[in-house]
């Protein structure tokens, strides 16, 4: 039987284990939290994990400036507060933020376009870390590039902080359509597709043969209601990230519980109607169409 230190090494570090942890979150809701009190609410309403950050995306948009990783002390407080996994956001290409989060003991790192990118050319090489990473993607080539770098989970980018699910739907549909295209191509055509789209060839073949991404694929970016969450599950997502939609709502506890229940009952309209009733107003939101291009976050880190 392995020693305790061996068990710890087995628990973290390999691609198999990293992807395994990500798969354990399937069918669940991961909620953004800023404080330990919010983390407690998230756990009590049924979140499978929480994402620690310095401000929810809607507030990041309002205040402007440079958005960075959360205060390490705050991350530690959140870890101590809840029994569910705690994730943390780092800036794109900011290896040191990721290293700090790993040293704090977070269960997963989100290399996130919501924060101000530290590097306009390169993402962090996630293969060097013991902790699993999640990254956003708008299409299949982008998703496969992140997986090649070591991402254990992909999420739609959507347009975070808007409460408008439109772009999350677009990104998920795009990925699904491109996968369907690949499944109908022969080996040589897939090789050509990989070259033309800047996608890793081996992952292109793996995706085509499996008919899905090699890692779990969650929805994120603009999900603000139980119906939004159910819609993304209908479109084939493995789970849901909710950022501003919980604590930007009139009643965060009711909204959090309802979104969790909607994910569990996404294919039952009668149940969804009951779930969505009497939970108070959702976040105000902002239409993606009204955003100037320079304020859109989804184009960061391709």
From Swiss-Prot:
Keywords: Lyase, Pyridoxal phosphate, Schiff base. The keyword Lyase applies. Pfam families: SOR_SNZ. It catalyses: aldehydo-D-ribose 5-phosphate + D-glyceraldehyde 3-phosphate + L-glutamine = pyridoxal 5'-phosphate + L-glutamate + phosphate + 3 H2O + H(+). D-glyceraldehyde 3-phosphate binds at residue 173. Its EC number is 4.3.3.6. Pathway: Cofactor biosynthesis; pyridoxal 5'-phosphate biosynthesis. Catalyzes the formation of pyridoxal 5'-phosphate from ribose 5-phosphate (RBP), glyceraldehyde 3-phosphate (G3P) and ammonia. The ammonia is provided by the PdxT subunit. Can also use ribulose 5-phosphate and dihydroxyacetone phosphate as substrates, resulting from enzyme-catalyzed isomerization of RBP and G3P, respectively. This is Pyridoxal 5'-phosphate synthase subunit PdxS. The lineage of its organism: Archaea, Methanobacteriati, Methanobacteriota, Stenosarchaea group, Halobacteria. The gene is pdxS.
């Amino acid at each position: 039987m392995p020693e305790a230190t061996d068990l710890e090494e087995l628990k973290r570090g390999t691609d198999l284990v990293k992807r395994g942890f990500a798969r354990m979150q399937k069918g669940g809701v991961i909620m953004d939290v800023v404080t330990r009190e919010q983390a407690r609410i998230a756990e009590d309403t049924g979140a499978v994990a929480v994402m620690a950050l310095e401000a929810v995306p809607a507030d990041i948009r309002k205040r402007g400036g440079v958005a960075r990783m959360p205060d390490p002390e705050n991350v530690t407080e959140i870890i101590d507060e809840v029994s569910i996994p705690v994730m943390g956001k780092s800036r794109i290409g900011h290896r040191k933020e990721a290293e700090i989060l790993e040293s704090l003991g977070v269960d997963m790192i989100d290399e996130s376009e919501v924060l101000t990118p530290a590097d306009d050319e390169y993402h962090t090489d996630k293969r060097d870390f013991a902790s699993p990473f999640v990254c956003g993607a708008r299409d299949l080539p982008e998703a496969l590039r992140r997986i090649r770098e070591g991402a254990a989970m992909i999420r739609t980018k959507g347009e975070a902080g808007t409460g408008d699910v439109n772009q999350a739907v677009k990104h998920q549909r795009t990925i699904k359509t491109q996968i369907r295209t690949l499944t109908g191509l022969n080996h040589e055509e897939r090789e050509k597709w990989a070259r033309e789209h800047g996608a890793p060839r081996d992952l292109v073949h793996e995706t085509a043969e499996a008919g899905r991404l090699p890692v779990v694929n969650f929805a994120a970016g603009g999900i603000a209601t139980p119906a939004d969450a159910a819609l993304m599950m209908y479109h084939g997502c493995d789970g849901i990230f909710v950022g501003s939609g919980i604590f930007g709502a009139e009643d965060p506890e009711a909204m959090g519980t309802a979104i969790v229940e909607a994910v569990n009952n996404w294919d039952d309209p009668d149940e969804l109607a009951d779930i969505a009733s009497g939970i108070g107003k959702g976040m105000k939101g902002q239409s993606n169409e009204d955003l100037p291009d320079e304020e859109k976050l989804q184009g960061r880190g391709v």
